[in-house]
Amino acid sequence: WEKAKEMLILPKVMEKMPDVNFYWVGDGPYRDKILPALEKFDNFHWLGHLKYPDEVRQFFSEIDIYALVSGIDMSPHTLLEAGLMKKPILATNVGGISESCKDGETCFLIKKNDSDDWINKISTLLNNKAKMKEMGESGYSYVKENFSWDKIADDFISILETNSKLASNKKN
């Protein structure tokens, strides 16, 4: 529930931003606790589960901004997918989210439980198309440079080499 209940700040955001459409993708055990609070807004649209990869790719191609509203998250792949689709990202600053993007460069990290921060950051992007494009391009580069299989393999080998040296030093 901790992950999903952060969505309950969205009514304040949607109420203050009636001209902005919000799409919720996904499903889960807490849908029945969240949907009633959101469905009363004309600018809210629940899409449910999308088939991977085609429907997910289509969704990312049609949105202007990707927002991850979460109370807790370790390392959500959706941030990387949004980056690869050159979308500016807004995400709650919890868990490992800050490791998937760079605040102010590839994303805006939002304070937990702060509807005003969401409103300000969404407005900042919607009112500055150049910033949206710049953030999307930076996100794409950041994902390519830091999350490619080659980079992951190099990092893993480096960890193994470091630990191998540490183990050798303990034996001596």
PLM regions: where:
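Nucleotide-activated donor-binding/catalytic signature segment of Leloir-type glycosyltransferases, i.e.
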Residues: 35-50
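Short hydrophobic beta-strand element within catalytic cores of glycosyltransferases
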Residues: 88-91
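C-terminal alpha-helical cap of glycosyltransferases
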Residues: 145, 149-172
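A conserved mid-protein helix/loop that constitutes part of the nucleotide-sugar donor-binding site
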Residues: 1-16, 29-32, 116
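A short, well-ordered alpha-helix in the C-terminal region of glycosyltransferases
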Residues: 117, 124, 131-145, 155-158
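Short alpha-helical donor nucleotide-sugar binding micro-motif in glycosyltransferases
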Residues: 58-63, 118
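Aromatic "clamp/platform" in nucleotide-sugar-dependent glycosyltransferases that forms part
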Residues: 71-72
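Conserved acidic donor-binding segment of nucleotide-sugar-dependent glycosyltransferases
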Residues: 103-104, 108-115, 124-129
